Each structure stands twice: as C-alpha cells, then as structure tokens.
C-alpha cells in the first residue's frame, strides 16, 4: 500500500480534481444558458492553463454575471470536500469506518473558524481546538449585558476626581465589544448589593454568552467602599458577596458562561515598593501543625457552585491604586488600551497579562494589577465585531 501511495503524484491528483470541478462547472454554465457556444469553446481552450495556475481563474470570470459567480462559488466550495474525501480515501484500508466522522469534525471546525473576527494585528488567534474556548453566540438575537458601578461622591471620604473619564472609557469599550452597559453611580454597600441582585436576575443573560462587572470606588483590603464608608462604621461590599450573587446556585442564566470582574480601588495604604539588593535571601513560611484536609459536598446538582469567574484588580493586597484627576485611573486607561489593541487576537487572560506587564517597571506611581479567583476552564476570546 505504501508503494501505491508513492507512485501517485499528488500534484497530478490535485489537477484531476481541479479539472473535474471545471468540467462540471462549464456544463452547468451551458445548461443554464449563461454562456453561448463560442464562449464555451474559448473557455475550454484555457482549462489546461487554469488547471496549472488556478489563481488566474477569478480574473477570467470577473466580467461575467452574478449568475456565473454563484455557480462558481458553489463548485469552488465543494472542491474542498472533494480534496478532503480523496485524502481520506488513500487510507481507507486503515480507517474507512472513521473517515466520515473525521471529515465532519474538520468541516465543523472550519465553520467556527470562519466566524472568528478579522484581526488587523500581525497575530491570528492561536486556537488549537474549538473545544478549548468558550462558545460565542451569534450577534443576531444575542443580549450581552455589562454592569458598571462607580462611586465618586462619598459622605466622609474624598471625591474621586477623574472617575467620569473611567466611566466613559469603560462604557465605550464594552459597547464596542457588543455589551449593553448599565451604569450605576454613588451607591452604598447595601445599594450595590441590591443592584447586583437585580442585574443577576435580568432575563437577557439567558441569551448572552458572558458578562462584565466593573467596580470603581475607594477600597480597603476587605472590599469596595460604599458611599457611607468611614473607619468607625465600615460600608463595604465584600468580594464574596459578588461571587455568591453570580454563582451557579443563584444565577442560573450565566451558568458555564464567563463572568469577568474588574475592580479599580485601593486595597490598603502601602505603596507596593521595596528596596532590594541584587542578591538576597528568601524566607519561607513554616507551620508546626500538620496540614489537615476535610472534604465535604453539600451540592444538590452535579455542577460547581463557583465556576467561570475571573477577577482583575488594580493592585496587590494592602497597596494603593493611582488615579489622575485629568486622565482617570492608570489601571483603567491601560486596560482599555490593551483591550482595543489585542482583543481580536488574544484571549482574556493574555490581555490581562499584557496590562500587568505594562506596570512591571516601577516608576513614580507604583502598582501591580493582580488576576485572582480564576475558575475559568476555557479560553475566553471576545471576537469583537461578531
């Protein structure tokens, strides 16, 4: 069988397929009275040239009618199936039973690849398996929602000047990514919780493939500050509250769909910097007590309570996040820039890492964004324009 494969010239095999396609194509033109006899004879004389140099085919037909274009399109697309079938036929002794299934899988993959957004950047989406990415719904009939909560006015804390720039920037970004954006401003922790519950209950999520939750406010290590916050009486929206409202137990409409949380807020008063020498000693935390693990399972249905989340925060724990009264927050401005630059060809976590990399070299305003509480099981590509 190996000798049979070597004796067959693959170039000639492709020419045979191309010639067969063209002959069938010309017959259809004749039957439908698109070309007369003289024109058919003229085209017939060029078949050999077309077979050897197929890129001239389109040029030979551009002056014909739309009917010619439609017939050619049908035959040209079917040629991919002919080539695929011929390739599988060479191994029919070894895998005749599975060839049709493999072909169907390849064709299904090709259909999905055609739906990817065109990327003006030099890199194409690096997708090796369509099952490794979150499904993206068709634009028609899809109802993506995003929520922005921004607190700029507080009863006891300073005004967050420049926050209006962050709102406009994030709203424009998310709308261009296909999300209808809900904006809420100046809420207490209780009011934020109420708005989150209302947003989680929106019926549009049933016909959506993902959601974004954006929080911009003063903050502490414990969470996002509400408008009534002060040291004596904390007004804090905790991370756990957000995750609980949108987990699979309480928000079924977003089950198995990416839920992206973005937080612009301080997480302490530290500046996030330390002076180090070129050579240092590292210390490790130790514990005298042995690690004990107890596993319990209270779930009623066979699904993870918390899954498909990712949180991107503007700074590391205990440290500040910087904001300019004229340009808005550094984190938000960098985030918007890299989303616009790379969302067509990189998945979400890669974009987040590019934002982190932009903060890698410390300068006057030091902060390091962090990716936290990740439970996403696939790559999330945004495919802008789709």
Swiss-Prot record:
InterPro entries: CARD, Caspase-like_dom_sf, Caspase_cys_AS, Caspase_his_AS, Pept_C14, Pept_C14_caspase, Pept_C14_p10, Pept_C14_p20. SUPFAM superfamilies: Caspase-like. Keywords: Apoptosis, Hydrolase, Phosphoprotein, Protease, Thiol protease, Zymogen. The keyword Phosphoprotein applies. GO terms for molecular function: cysteine-type endopeptidase activity. GO terms for cellular component: AIM2 inflammasome complex; IPAF inflammasome complex; NLRP3 inflammasome complex. Coiled coil: none annotated. It comes from the Eukaryota. GO terms for biological process: apoptotic process; proteolysis; regulation of apoptotic process; regulation of inflammatory response. Its EC number is 3.4.22.-. Residues 1-91 form the CARD domain. The modification Phosphoserine is found at residue 84. The active site is at 218, 266. Signal peptide: none annotated. Heterotetramer that consists of two anti-parallel arranged heterodimers, each one formed by two subunits (Potential). May interact with TRAF2. Involved in the activation cascade of caspases responsible for apoptosis execution. PANTHER family: CASPASE RECRUITMENT DOMAIN-CONTAINING PROTEIN 18, CASPASE-12. Belongs to the peptidase C14A family. This is Caspase-12. It comes from Canis lupus familiaris (Dog).
